[in-house]
């Protein structure tokens, strides 16, 4: 039942984007060879109170992110790579710890060979992990804040390899469907050796450092101008494991809105939704809003 619905969804999705491509004038001319683009964003938000009767906590948060794209096209062959790195922390006046609000390393690379119109046979690689240690925070009997390490660099790490069909309208709109996708989840035994019998760490059983899955995946990207000076970016990744609970689809969806003030300043909103029942059987939500300083990566040498 799930697989049938899964493939119906794919057909509807491709039909929608195909209709879109027919309705919108294609003003993108394919340039052969290499193209690159990217941006560096420094996002900050801050709250301060002094003798504020209603109460409140002083806080400051900052996030640095790099988003880089490398695209190649020649004789029907395409190779599109997106690399994202982001790290952010928050400090509240009532906490002795700096706490992460963002921590992400991700590389997504798709290679395709065109066979008709905007469709290509494809193979892809996706890698995801984080930069720094992640902690679970609590308060002990004395009322002091404590923390326990839960994650770190490469714990967990996700590697996906798959083959399928790649539909690409342009660099701002594409979908990749890979019905044959292998996924490897890696972690240090530091986090699995002390698990109780039957417990798992991101799906990895006690005493092990990896888990292999075989399933299907969908990844898509869409960037467009909502109104003048307001750009929206949507990224979605879906994965279903054929070997274990195929109806539990892992979701990673990110919506980014950039409201331009001038060439270097913008107001930025990021909303991310995650679901992975190997990690937690609940929908995870993250939202960040603030003032961002944005620099085009290609302009950095000129500025320096």
Descriptions of predicted regions:
Residues 285-304:
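Outer-membrane beta-barrel "beta-signal"
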Residues 77-79, 118-121, 172-175, 229-232, ...:
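Repeated loop/turn-to-beta-strand initiation elements of outer-membrane beta-barrel proteins
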Residues 51-56, 91-97, 144-151, 200-208, ...:
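Extracellular loop and loop/strand-boundary signature of outer-membrane beta-barrel proteins
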Residues 38-40, 81, 123-125, 163, ...:
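Membrane-embedded beta-strand positions of outer-membrane beta-barrel proteins
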Residues 42-44, 64-72, 107-113, 127, ...:
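Residues on the lipid-exposed face of transmembrane beta-strands in outer-membrane beta-barrel proteins
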Residues 58-64, 101-105, 155-159, 210-216, ...:
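Residues that define the transmembrane beta-barrel architecture of outer-membrane proteins
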Residues 42-48, 74-76, 85-91, 127-133, ...:
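Transmembrane beta-strands of outer-membrane beta-barrel pores
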Residues 100-213:
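Outer-membrane pore/translocation modules
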């Amino acid at each position: 039942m799930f697989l049938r619905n899964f493939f119906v969804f794919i057909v509807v999705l491709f039909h929608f984007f195909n209709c879109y491509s027919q309705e919108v004038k294609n003003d993108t001319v394919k340039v052969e060879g290499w193209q690159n683009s990217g941006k560096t964003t420094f996002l900050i938000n801050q709250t301060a109170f002094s003798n504020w009767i209603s109460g409140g906590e002083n806080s400051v948060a900052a996030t640095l992110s790099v988003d880089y794209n490398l695209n190649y096209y020649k004789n029907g062959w395409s190779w599109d790579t997106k690399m994202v790195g982001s790290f952010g922390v928050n400090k509240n006046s009532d906490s002795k710890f700096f706490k992460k609000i963002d921590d992400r390393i991700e590389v997504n690379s798709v290679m395709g060979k065109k066979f008709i119109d905007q469709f290509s046979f494809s193979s892809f690689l996706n890698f995801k992990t984080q930069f720094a240690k992640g902690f679970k925070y609590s308060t002990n009997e004395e009322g002091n804040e404590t923390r326990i390490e839960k994650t770190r660099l490469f714990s967990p790490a996700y590697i996906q390899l798959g083959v399928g069909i790649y539909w690409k309208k342009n660099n701002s709109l594409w979908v990749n469907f890979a019905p044959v996708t292998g996924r490897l989840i890696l972690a240090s035994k530091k986090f699995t050796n002390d698990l109780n019998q039957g417990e798992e760490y991101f799906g990895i059983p006690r005493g092990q450092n990896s888990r292999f899955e075989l399933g299907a995946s969908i990844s898509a990207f869409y960037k467009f101008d909502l109104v003048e000076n307001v750009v929206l970016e949507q990224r979605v990744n879906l994965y279903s494991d054929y070997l274990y609970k195929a109806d539990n689809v892992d979701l990673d969806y990110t919506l980014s809105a950039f409201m331009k003030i001038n060439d270097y300043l913008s107001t930025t909103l990021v909303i991310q939704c995650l679901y992975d029942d190997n990690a937690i059987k609940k929908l995870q939500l993250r939202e960040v809003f603030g003032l961002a300083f944005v620099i085009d990566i290609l302009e950095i040498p000129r500025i320096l």
